[in-house]
Amino acid sequence: VLLHPNFSDEEANGVAVSFDPFYQTEGHFYLNTQVGENLITNPDAQSIPEEILLDKVRGGPFTIVRPSNQVEDGEQVLTIAHMESLRTMLQKVTSRFRNLYGKSVRDEFAIDVEFKITSEGLLSIKQARPWIF
């Protein structure tokens, strides 16, 4: 059983994957984020989520593959601080799950994480699970 608090008035919610399953780039985390409580899995019909490829290296660059249509032009759903928090968290969670599952760094292995940005602007991990290749 997984229990977590209900987040009211969240700034954003999303899914982060510790590799890039969609554009097949090397050395990136894939981030898919919606504004507020609009779900990634079942969004409002006209809502487009923000897609980011985040370099795995701390402080490294990011690419907005697709901007959200729920923010002003030129604005982002995730701040630089949020992306840095996600980068750090993805590295830690992937490493710990890799060890738990007995996978070496040579094995194909990745983690899929659901996250929230709370109304206080803090990253909260809702759940993490291995990506199935």
Which ranges hold each PLM region?
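Nucleotide/phosphate-binding sheet-loop regions of phosphoryl- and nucleotidyl-transfer enzymes
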Residues: 1-133
